[in-house]
Amino acid sequence: MEWIKQLGKLLLVLVLQVLLFNRIQIAGWCFPMVYILFLINLPANLPRWTEMLIGAFVGIIVDVWYSSIGVHMAACVALSFLRPILLHNLVQDVERVTNSVSRLTIGRIEYMKCAITLTFIHHLLVFALEAWSLQNWWLVLLQTLISSMMTLLVILGYDSLKR
């Protein structure tokens, strides 16, 4: 039954990304990628291979909508690979977290650190792979920072609504 709930969350996040957040582009610098909320909030007790497979699946779906060849998939797989490492470093008893990761299950500060780190890494990979050059690295970094801030506003705002 839990997997049906997770599938529903995934569909909701992807529909919102494609229909709403895909249309929000501020001056060509801000591209909120809120779909990573699903990957960040996956249960902490998932096997790593399952988490990475889910990340690849989510990334492929987003790549189809954005017409990007593997960019989002690579960034989502990297996020899915790094998330358990980050959780084990931030949360002392991460094995006890069987539900979705949120501020309620791991703590507010730990969740914010996790969300900020994973969002920045994901966005940096997306924009660096899209640029495919280090010639204008500062533009990639600026776009990463601005888009990460917008994405984090939505992610942390959503999480603050949970009770």
Model region roles, listed by residue range:
Residues 1-163:
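Terminal, non-globular segments
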